[in-house]
């Protein structure tokens, strides 16, 4: 070893230690004693350490900092400004009540900020300044009551905002201004009484909107009109929502709509009819009792319908006709006794059918389901029979391909009991026809009027729930034959009855229409041919009697005068000519005939 190299070799073993000592404070080699650090992931974990201030000496290249579950009460401006590489900051479940404007200044790389479970009350402008790269902000479980105008104006990269479980009562119209990339927002368990439509209209890139557990009674027409890019809308647990206004979804072009655990009593067809691109519809846990025929046909691209945990008792034939892409139906946990093949446009295209939890009657109406049982996805619980008794509790998957006699059969409908086949009623009276039938499954009763039209459940002439035909305020035009038809899936039977109507004249003897009356105003006077004949008779008979009486009196008078002379003589005095002064008078004799 020469003198030139000796000094160099002497300090080389100490060079790494010297390098670390010369690094500025807070490098990755340092870690606060109250925290745990990992150099591989550049993460610092200081959660649940009862800290009331942010510890010093944090590594400058930290990318994840977890300070959750401590006692932090506030953040001052620039407190974290040295952590320029920080990407995720968790401040959840502290006691933060104030965030000074500029508190996050210098965190230009931060992507995720979690502030849930604190005591924040008002979010105003400037609080989140400097967070130009932030994509997720979680403000749940605070005490926030107001979002002021411009509260998030500097978060131009924000894509997801969570603000549930707050005391939120008002969202200023410009609160969400500047959130040009926000794609998802969740408002849940707040005190909002209306949907903040004006504020939401400031979100041009919003794709998913979740409105959960809100005490809002209605979604007014046009409330979400400005959200043309919205694809997913979730309305969950609005106990006061009983119906959707027809125009409540106007302006939307949704592909997924969920209105669950509300109080809808029927499918809101009028509000849905324009959603031609809707693929998924979830109306589960609503008191909906029926799906009528063809009302879903405007939703031509609908693929999935979920209506589990509702009150469904019937799904009509042709209920899903017009839905050429339909492949999933979830109606588990309802009150359905059957599901007929005719409800679907093409049962073979059905992939998933959730039907468990229904009191199914395993008769001929479910033979199609038995045929497809090995191909269909029934989920974790396949449907089971609730009746007849000999198959009660048996899953559809347990049946063999060759059925024993008496399994999955039906009996055609037959009329067993009916009232009089000929009924006579007075005009303005009341007429009733009874009709019932037997069969398996139990048949339905329908009535056809004389003109050939089927009668409904409402109106002056209506069919009651028990199949009875009731005609109130009988009119002359109600006269004719009425046909009772009892039918089920196995067949039908019919019975012809007749109604005869007796016309009743008003007390004043006129034949005016008794149906046209107004209090205090006399109605118009109309006569039919019989009335005209009566009027003519009443006028002609007195006239004829008077003329006959006159001629009779004249005849009696003439007989009282004796023999009648048939000639008479009278003098005729002609004009005297000017030249004849002695001419006398002329006598003329005329005969009376």
From Swiss-Prot:
It comes from Mus musculus (Mouse). The chain crosses the membrane at residues 534-554. It is found in: Membrane. Glycans are attached at residues 191, 253, 263, 492, 508, 515. Residues 555-593 are cytoplasmic. Disulfide bonds join 435-484. Residues 412-502 form the Ig-like C2-type domain. Residues 30-60 form the LRRNT domain. This is Leucine-rich repeat and immunoglobulin-like domain containing-NOGO receptor-interacting protein 4. It holds the Pfam family I-set. The keyword Signal applies.
